[in-house]
Amino acid sequence: MGPIIGVTATLKEDPQLMATRPLGSFVRADLDYVVGVADAGGVPVVLPPIPGTAEKMAERIDGLLLSGGSDLDPSYYGEKPVPELDVTLPERDAFEMALVEHVLDRGVPVFGICRGLQVLNVALGGTLYQDLPSQYSSDGLIAHRQKMPKWQWTHEVEVDDNSEMAQIMDSVDLRVNSYHHQAVKNLAEPLSVVAQACDGVVEAAEYPDLSERWIVGVQWHAEAMRDTQSPEHRNLFTAHVAAAEQYALRRAVA
């Protein structure tokens, strides 16, 4: 059996259920994430954002995939909300911030996608642009919320050719999709920027030595770009699962 990869999930409210069920919500993880893990040889396990469970979940997984989703509450990086802030989910925010703390303490390999990169950055001490169009000072800001289907690329990113990301992707020029209005502002000190869009927006970050700590985050939705048109994005899942497998082996003999 492959390594167990925890995949974070979101909460969706169903008004029709609220009349008959106390919680009135259901947990959702997009299938693209779990299929991406499974195709890479991992065993995906969806992690519902239940208060008080983060530490126990961290103890049982070999890798963590932080999925995309809603905006992160800016109070986690010391700011008040701007008018352009979208919906936040307090339960999910609190759970994921605690979960990241516990998995990093244990050395669990972490892969963040879109919101996942943002959560990683904030958990490690960084900050975010709450809304790129209103806060990012660049005349050449490109559209980071595409209207095309998620599996279609909409802009290019340049990868640092000295980065481990370049080795994983086997390329320094990537075509990516874009579904976000928040982004990394001040990067957390342990991380390095390894990919940027043409407007300077951070598109990927990593821990400088992945053999020491496997921490990688990308701003694009790699889970939706694993088809034959963009096969290089599968490499991210493959590398993460491989790191999780090594973590599982070390844990077994500890």
Predicted feature residues:
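Active-site-proximal beta-strand elements of phosphoester/diester hydrolases
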Residues: 215-219
